[in-house]
């Protein structure tokens, strides 16, 4: 399996915690992966859409990032990101999401690590890739 991790690095400590969990889960699942970074969560869906149209597509995608700040702003960023990620998933992409919504960066970091949100996102992606392969819907040919 070849997986693309798209991470928003707006909060570097949170991103590192999410990435640690995701890479550990992908390594445990014996998946190959590449990692690309974008500035914030709103860019994650666009990056995945671009990658899905590339000449060498991936079997699945993992979206990692965090949203903090005043509730009304953070909730809007989170909702719009999730809406776009859900649309990508509904189009048939195997996509695991690990987007953390919290009041501040410290709380986001704690959530990311204690709940292994990055690992959960990677495991969700892998399970969807496996489902697609079982049903004959693999995104790419396996080597």
PLM features per residue range, with description:
Residues 28-55:
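Active-site rim loops that border cofactor/substrate pockets in soluble metabolic enzymes
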Residues 71-74, 78, 105-114, 126, ...:
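Phosphate/ribose-phosphate-bearing ligand recognition and processing surfaces
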Residues 76-102:
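Short, acidic/small-residue loops that bind anionic groups at enzyme active sites
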């Amino acid at each position: 399996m070849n997986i693309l991790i798209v991470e928003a690095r707006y909060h570097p400590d949170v991103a590192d915690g999410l990435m640690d969990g995701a890479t550990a889960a992908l390594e445990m699942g014996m998946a190959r992966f590449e990692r690309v970074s974008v500035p914030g969560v709103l860019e994650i869906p666009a990056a995945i859409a671009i990658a899905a149209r590339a000449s060498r597509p991936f079997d699945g995608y993992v979206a990692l990032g965090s949203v903090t700040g005043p509730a009304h702003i953070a909730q809007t960023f989170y909702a719009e990101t999730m809406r776009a990620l859900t649309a990508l998933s509904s189009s048939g992409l195997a996509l695991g999401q690990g987007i953390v919504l919290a009041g501040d960066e410290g709380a986001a970091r704690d959530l990311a690590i204690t709940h292994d949100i990055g690992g959960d996102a990677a495991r969700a992606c892998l399970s969807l890739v496996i489902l697609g392969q079982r049903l004959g819907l693999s995104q790419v040919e396996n080597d």
